[in-house]
Amino acid sequence: MKKILENIINLFKKKIQKENVDNMQEEDNTLENNDNNNEIMPESTNNIPETVIYIDNGHGNDTPGKRSPYSSKGIKPELDFYEYKWNREIANEIYNSLKGMGYDVRLLVTEDNDISLKERVNRVNKMCSQVGKDKVILVSVHSNAAGSGSEWKDARGWSAYTTKGTTKSDKLAEYLYAEAEKNFKGLKIRTDKSDGDKDWESDFYILKNTNCPAVLTENFFYDNIEDLKYILSDEGRKMVIKTHVDGIINYLNAI
């Protein structure tokens, strides 16, 4: 009988010890959770401006001309160039780069066929009316030509255009020029300093009629054989894309 009582007492002691251990572990877990809940989280570093960026890819697959002299002639297929196709490829890469960094960027034209300038302008101005013209910018991507594209020409270089007069577009062009001068070392940068800045001024419909800051870039001459080789090269494409992406970001950070 005495042995049985001793066994019962020992079992009771073990049960109490186990309950004490379990309670201590539960308290430790509670304290740990409280500590985790009280951790100071890093502040958000998202300082991206709330600006809608439109990237316009000039022309369409039904736009006449707009091709290099050798295109479709089978002379040197590696020098075939169709502006609408190249514009879209570059615009898509600019879009992807900015989108990947969290910017609100849109492709103005997603159709393959040429969309009228009036419709392009309407799309931009509709957004301007929704969010405010100071919250929208437009960059229209093109490649230049000195003639009809049937013969090789001597004209070369990169340039950007704004509408006539002093406008907020001039500032956007200024940042694009700054990047072009860094990225296109040894290549011609075409400027017009007659009005005190580097960009060229023109009454291009898409610049004159949009309500927001707008710049049209002419990314070298596709009817100059040296310029064409450059913009068809991996390095040339990379630098054209980088110029637009960095120029846009630097402009947005400055306004």
Where are these regions (language model features)?
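Short, low-complexity, charged amphipathic interaction modules
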Residues: 1-26
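Active-site-adjacent mobile loop/cap segments within catalytic or ligand-binding domains
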Residues: 54, 140, 144-147, 191-255
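Solvent-exposed loop/turn segments at secondary-structure junctions
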Residues: 59-62, 110-115, 143-149, 165-168, ...
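Active-site-adjacent substrate-binding region
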Residues: 169-197
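Active-site histidine-acidic residue metal-binding/catalytic motifs
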Residues: 32, 37-123, 147, 154-156
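Mature extracellular/periplasmic domains of secretome proteins
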Residues: 117-134, 204-209
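Extracytoplasmic/secreted envelope proteins and their assembly/folding machinery
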Residues: 88-95, 118-121, 157, 169-177, ...
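Loop/turn elements at helix/coil->beta-strand transitions in domains of secreted/extracellular proteins
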Residues: 50-51, 100-106, 131-138, 185-186, ...
